Structures are given as structure tokens and as C-alpha cells.
Amino acid sequence: STLDRSSAASDVYKRQTTDMQDPNRTLLGLNQRAWLTQQLASSKATWQVLGQQVLMSKMLVPAEMLQVLSAISSGAVTPEVLAQVNQLIKELVEIKLRYLNHDPSLTVEQLSRIKTVVPYNLDSWDGYAVERETLYGTLQYLNKKVVVLAGDTHNAWASDLHDLTGQFVGVELATSSVSSPGMEKYLSIPIQQLKEFESAFTTLIDELSYCNLNQRGYLKVRFTAEQVQADWIFVDTIKNKEYIVDETRSHQVILDPTLLPVSALKQTA
């Protein structure tokens, strides 16, 4: 099958944009949002830590890429589709890298391909964009930054959070699942290709700095007065009582109280 990555992608973009901007959509509810605002306002702690279930970062992918992900997750994983996926990702990443390097030769059409973005999961905070912006506005007003802890997706993520004006408001540290399957099952594509997806995701999704899409494990976060250290830890298998920590895929981030990196260690197979 051949994927149409133009008209349908545009329709999805228009429909989802309208829904996301509905001010009546709420993930917290009025009472919980008021409680959270009061807690943030009264807190004297060094760290403002928000533990909750779903991703808060803007996980916005090029609209045509969302079509590909939908096709794959529906089970349409044929050699032809995989070849199209590879080509599409290669094209989008190349355009995005040229854009980041301020390439003046990019065409309007090419720029549109990477700037026409849609959320891939409206059950997360991306589906409640107005309320998320309200929360970010509260943080800005209080002159506080937040460390958001998340899960839900069964995959590991790290992101920098920004409001719609581009102001940095915090970081998100999201854990993988201990045993439940992640994208390695839902996308049903080879592990090596998933690793290529990881690289593509961190290039194409502006807020995303790290992801692991195929391994099970946990996230260990340690707070001191001087820094927060996050360690993503993965095991080589969950199908056997005998397992080892896969140190080749570990990831560590250390941040100071302003949430700027003290150091970062990446080891990616």
C-alpha cells in the first residue's frame, strides 16, 4: 500500500488543532487545579515536583509522520510500508537538520513538512493544551520551575518544557514500564528500526531530548539541595528470571536547582 502524506495529514491537523484549543477541556478539573495552584504558591521547597501519570511535554510530530505511525500500529507492517517509513523519516530528519543549521535554500514546501505538526496522543497533556498553558502561566507568575514525573506510555522519555512563547518552565522525566510492552509491540517493527525512530523522534520533536522505545525498566530520581539526578535503568529481558542491567542503554541527567544541566551522560547502543 502507498501512503498519502498530504491531504489527509492536513485534515488531521485542522481537526485536532480545533479540539486542542477548546478551553473547556480539563485534565485536572477545577478543584484539583485550584489545589495545585495553591500548593505551588505556598511552597518554599528547592524543587517543585509534580508527579502525575501522562506526558506533559509537547509531543508534536510532523503530520505526515503521524499517518505512518497510525498505519504501522494498525498492523500494516509490510516490507513496502517499512521502506516508505525509512524514506519518510530520512527526508524529514534531513529537512529538520537543515532547518536547525539555518539553511536558506529550504523551500516553503519543505518547511511546511516539518512545521505542520500534530500531537500523536491526545490522551496526554497535548489533548489539554489550554489547561497546560494555564499551568505554565502559573509557574511563570510564581517564578518557579517544575520537575514533572510521568509514565503511562510504557516508554522512557526526557523533555524540556516550554510555554507557547518559548519560555522554559521545567523538565519532564518519564519512566518506562517494568513489564508492560511499549512501542516495540504497538509498532511491530524490528528493534533496530525502533532505535532509528528514537534518533528521529529527538530530532523532529522539539521538546524531546531523549527516548527509549523498546526496553523495560525504571527511572530512579534523586533530589539533594544542590541537584537532581535522573537515571534510566533497563534490563536485557523480562522473559527470564535471569537478567542483567543493560548498561549500554543507560541514560543519566543531572540538573541544578534552575534545571540547567550540571552534566549529562548518554550511552546508546
What are these regions, as identified by a protein language model?
Residues 10-156:
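His/acidic metal-ligating clusters that form di-metal
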Residues 130-189:
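Conserved beta-sheet core of the metallophosphoesterase superfamily
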Residues 1-9, 13:
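Single conserved hydrophobic/aromatic residue that forms the stacking wall/gate
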Residues 206-269:
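A short C-terminal boundary segment appended to hydrolase-like catalytic domains
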Residues 50, 58-76, 147-173, 230-255:
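C-terminal/domain-terminus segments
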Residues 177-210, 234, 250-253:
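Acidic, Ser/Thr/Pro-rich beta/coil linker or hinge segments at domain junctions
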Residues 46, 144-145, 169, 217-219, ...:
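A short pocket-lining beta-strand/turn micro-motif at the edge of beta-sheets
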Residues 41-44, 140-142, 164-167, 212, ...:
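Extracellular/periplasmic catalytic domains that process cell-envelope and extracellular macromolecules
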